[in-house]
Amino acid sequence: MAKVALIQRELKREKLAAKYAAKYAELKAIASDAKRSDEEREAARLGLQKLPRNANPTRQRNRCEITGRPRGTFRQFGLARAKIRELAFAGDIPGVTKASW
């Protein structure tokens, strides 16, 4: 089980990223647009640097919904591999069966 503080930190990052998503996308588009002048692009880069560090969506980490484990998390289920195994064997995940070939 992950510490509560780490899970709360991730939730805080999600909220910040959602809050600044439009501004971040706008500045990112300007900074990467080759048709814009160098001054505009530089101003956009400076604007990106002034945003909070945690507003960047790449700083978010996928965590297991149950345990909070940051590694071995499957996006499709939102669960860590160990929890997927437990729940699949218990029959709690519909459509998931043990492989046999």
UniProtKB/Swiss-Prot annotation:
Biased composition (Basic and acidic residues): 33-44
SUPFAM superfamilies named among the record's database cross-references: Glucocorticoid receptor-like (DNA-binding domain)
Superkingdom to which the source organism belongs: Bacteria
Annotated spans, Disordered: 32-67
InterPro entries found in the cross-reference section: Ribosomal_uS14 (IPR001209), Ribosomal_uS14_bac/plastid (IPR023036)
Keywords from the named record: Ribonucleoprotein, Ribosomal protein, RNA-binding, rRNA-binding
Segment forming the signal sequence: none
Pfam families: Ribosomal_S14
GO CC field: cytoplasm; small ribosomal subunit
NCBIfam families from the UniProt entry: PRK08881.1
Assembly, per entry: Part of the 30S ribosomal subunit. Contacts proteins S3 and S10.
Protein name: Small ribosomal subunit protein uS14
